């Protein structure tokens, strides 16, 4: 008998393929007897390139088509696991699916990218009315608080497409905002003009980490994933996802986070913000908690902070955003 094959699913974009192959290598390094193959698929989020993400909620934009293949009738098309950018993965998965593991986190920050020919080095340099390209309402809402004189316009497409739009001499954008991790994974770290930290902008829940989705209760896959996943990223991201789930936010709403786990003290510091779309109202808070049971305590940390923020008005902000989306 030959080696057992594992089918790994992911999106078709260049970044998604790099991420799927990264997980393939992690598995094959620990389990050389497995023959891993990557299967790619276009998702609804890939197909709808002309509308801002904010306008249609986006809770399963990047996942559903791939999930169908975890239970596919045809063995040649059936997947064993799916690799997602964790920030695109809904915090509540459909019945029959679960988050099997989280890989080591790459830089979770957002970053500013200027065109090759630009003399500007930061948002502070931009003139009044300068146009910032971003499809993320989380990014634009937070930046509007600090830079009310700038304009924010949607820019869709994969990383290469967005960079081409930015570098075009006729581009309407003075700059664009991207996730630092995506550029780093693609070998484009040289395009990062400036990284943002929480004094300017909190990053997305799960940003910089990969989430691996499996069939619920698949003990064989769980055993494999236990060997390739990262404790620090798991603690931070489980707390961030619990916060988002308690706030009932999808990946297209203005919830920003920053988390840090200290492996010596076993304490997790979680900071979060909820902002209205125009950047005029915000609820910001933080919590530090001792993590003794990885799953239970990490999730409790996020839930407690979210409940405090709801009491301070965060839910009201998010409910108004959802009402605007329905109109």
Swiss-Prot record:
Function: Catalyzes the tetrapolymerization of the monopyrrole porphobilinogen (PBG) into the hydroxymethylbilane pre-uroporphyrinogen in several discrete steps.
NCBIfam families assigned to the protein according to its UniProt record, in alphabetical order: hemC (TIGR00212)
Cofactor needs: dipyrromethane
GO molecular function: hydroxymethylbilane synthase activity
Catalytic activity as recorded in UniProt: 4 porphobilinogen + H2O = hydroxymethylbilane + 4 NH4(+)
Domain of life: Eukaryota
Protein name in the entry: Porphobilinogen deaminase
Organism, scientific name: Saccharomyces cerevisiae (strain ATCC 204508 / S288c)
Cofactor notes: Binds 1 dipyrromethane group covalently.
GO cellular component, one term: cytoplasm
């Amino acid at each position: 008998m030959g080696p057992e094959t594992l089918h790994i699913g992911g999106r078709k974009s260049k970044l998604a393929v790099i991420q799927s192959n990264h997980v393939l290598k992690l598995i094959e390094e620990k389990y050389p007897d497995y023959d891993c193959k990557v299967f790619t698929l276009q998702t609804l989020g890939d197909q709808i390139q002309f509308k801002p993400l904010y306008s249609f909620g986006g809770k399963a934009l990047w996942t559903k088509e791939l999930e169908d293949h975890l239970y596919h009738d045809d063995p040649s098309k059936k997947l064993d696991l799916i690799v997602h950018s964790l920030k695109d993965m809904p915090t509540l998965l459909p019945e029959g699916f679960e988050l099997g593991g989280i890989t080591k986190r790459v830089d979770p920050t957002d970053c500013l990218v200027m065109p090759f020919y630009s003399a500007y080095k930061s948002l502070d340099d931009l003139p009044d009315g300068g146009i910032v390209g971003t499809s993320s309402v989380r990014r634009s809402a937070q930046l509007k608080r600090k830079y009310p004189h700038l304009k924010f316009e949607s820019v869709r497409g994969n990383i290469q497409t967005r960079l081409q739009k930015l570098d075009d001499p006729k581009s309407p954008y003075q700059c664009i905002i991207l996730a630092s991790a995506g550029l780093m994974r693609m070998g484009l770290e040289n395009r990062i003009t400036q990284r943002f930290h929480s004094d300017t902008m909190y990053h997305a829940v799960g940003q910089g980490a990969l989430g691996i989705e499996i069939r619920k209760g698949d003990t064989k896959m769980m055993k494999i994933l236990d060997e390739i996943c990262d404790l620090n990223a798991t603690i931070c991201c489980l707390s961030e996802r619990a916060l988002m789930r308690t706030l009932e936010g999808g990946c297209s709403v203005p919830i920003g986070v920053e988390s840090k786990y200290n492996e010596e003290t076993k304490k997790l510091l979680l900071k979060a913000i909820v902002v209205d779309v125009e950047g005029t109202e915000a609820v910001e808070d933080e919590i530090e908690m001792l993590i003794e049971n990885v799953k239970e305590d990490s999730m409790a940390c996020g839930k407690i902070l979210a409940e405090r923020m709801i009491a301070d008005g965060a839910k009201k902000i998010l409910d108004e955003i959802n009402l605007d989306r329905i109109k």
